[in-house]
Each structure stands twice: as C-alpha cells, then as structure tokens.
Amino acid sequence: MRKVPGPITLIEPLSGNTSLLIKINAIHSVKKSPYQEIIIADTEDYGRVLILDDYIQSSYVDEQYYHESLVHPAMATHPNPRDVLILGGGEGATLREALKHGTVKRAVMVDIDRDVVELSRAYLPQMHQGAFDDPRAKVVIQDGFVYVEEAIKAGDKYDVIIMDLTDPYSSDIAKQLYTREFFAKIRRILNDDGVVVTQAGNSFYFPAEYDMVLEGVKANFPIVAEYEVWIPSFGYAVNFILGSLRYDPHALTPSEVDERLRARGVKTAFYTGRVHLALMNMPIHRKLR
C-alpha cells in the first residue's frame, strides 16, 4: 500500500458536464490491463474502492446497496434457481450474493479481465468473502459474448443470468453485451422459466443508452421490470432491468420474498421483501423537460 503524500482527488465523471470529487487517502494497486486501468484505493468517505477507467465500480461502505439490488430481485423471482451465470462482476461480490441462495448448485462467473479478478482476490476480501473458492463456483476468464455463443452451441442452460458489466457508455468493453441481438442470445441459454437481470447505467444522464438496453430486454422477454437504487459512491441512482420468461417480480408480496430468503438461508443488509416491493413500484428518473 502506498500512502498518498498529499491530498489526491479522484475526478469521477457523472456525465460530460458533471463530475464527482472523491478524496483518496491511500493507493493499494494501479495496473493497466489489456482492457482497462484498474485502481484499488482507500477513500475518505467510501472506504476501499475498485476503480475502472476513472469510474468507481464498488466501495466497501455501500456495495451491498448495489449487489443485493442487482442479484436478489431476480433470484427471489425464480422459485428454484439452481444454475446461475454471472457476466462480469470481477470483484466477486455478485457471485457472493448469488451463492447465498441455498438452491444454487452451480454459479459460473465470466469476466474478461483476469487482472480485475486477481487484484480483487488480493485486495478486496470484504467484497468476495471467499466466494471464488466456493465449490459451487466456477470462474472463467473469457469474453462474455464468446462464452454465451459457446454455451448456445453446447446447449448449456441457466435459471438466472446476472449481467454485472461496466456501463454501456463508460467503455467499449461491454457495449456489444447490451444490444437487442445479445439479449436474444441470452434468452437461448435460459431455461423456459428463466430470468435475466442487468445493470443499465443511469437513465438521467444517459437516457439514450438506457433506452437501448431497455428495448433490447423488452424485445426478448414478455415480462420486464425497471428499478433503480441510489449509490452514494457513484453519485447517482443505478438503473437495473429485469427480464423474465414466466415469473413476474411485480406479483411477489413482501412476505413471499421474505419467506424465500428465509427458506434459502439468505442474510442481507439491505434487500428485504418490503425493499423488493418498493423497487418494483418506484419511478425511473429522467430529465424533466
């Protein structure tokens, strides 16, 4: 770890015109991978953070808002999720949350960047909490697009697919995984009652990109849910889009969600049945013109 010899400020862009200033106290690792710049640092307000190409991906003090909201609505919507695929999520927290469900027999995490996974394993233990070593988990270092195409050819199927990728507007790495055509491929590797969920960036600052993702999901799934959660270290509300082939997340009552979590042995810090109800009934923020 390198102590910062003076005040260093991360300038995190929220849009082309607005930025968030974050004080950094110490830097643990800086590495330029073949795909992106990776920084792991300690911040004043958000604790340890993973930064990819100037964007905070996760922070110790608020990552549960993000990861629990990404994972559990989809997992709770499915009555018996056994096989789970995660695209992205290199710090291991999405894998951690999925593995909390006692129904899960197999969880495959596919990330294109080996360096993110290895640095997260070394410097972000609070994120993964040993999930990489769970016997039900398999970590694959591969382009998610290629993995899905190979899964189609192999006839591999999943109950829940969780897309924890970089934003559709922040870099070129994941853009092809947000298209209508890719969601058609996702549908082909889901079981007949499967569920997919993706983070979709921010609808306020990037409405066109958000709409692209939303239309891609709507074109391929009969049941669609939009929801969002404020993430302090991001400086904005993160949007999520859930697509389902059979089960409607809007139909779940708080007591049904809580009972599914209890039966599966899931312990959460943020997500509950009442939170699920709130997520499914909140407005999506856009600029009011």
UniProtKB/Swiss-Prot annotation:
Spermidine binds at residues 67, 91. The gene is speE. Catalyzes the irreversible transfer of a propylamine group from the amino donor S-adenosylmethioninamine (decarboxy-AdoMet) to putrescine (1,4-diaminobutane) to yield spermidine. One of its GO terms (cellular component) is cytoplasm. Residues 5-245 form the PABS domain. Belongs to the spermidine/spermine synthase family. GO terms for biological process: spermidine biosynthetic process. Keywords: Cytoplasm, Polyamine biosynthesis, Spermidine biosynthesis, Transferase. GO terms for molecular function: spermidine synthase activity; thermospermine synthase activity. InterPro entries: PABS (IPR030374), PABS_CS (IPR030373), SAM-dependent_MTases_sf (IPR029063), Spermi_synthase (IPR001045), Spermidine_synt_N (IPR035246), Spermidine_synt_N_sf (IPR037163). It is an enzyme of class 2 (transferase). Pathway: Amine and polyamine biosynthesis; spermidine biosynthesis; spermidine from putrescine: step 1/1. The keyword Transcription regulation does not apply. This is Polyamine aminopropyltransferase. Pfam families: Spermine_synt_N, Spermine_synth. The active site is at residue 164.
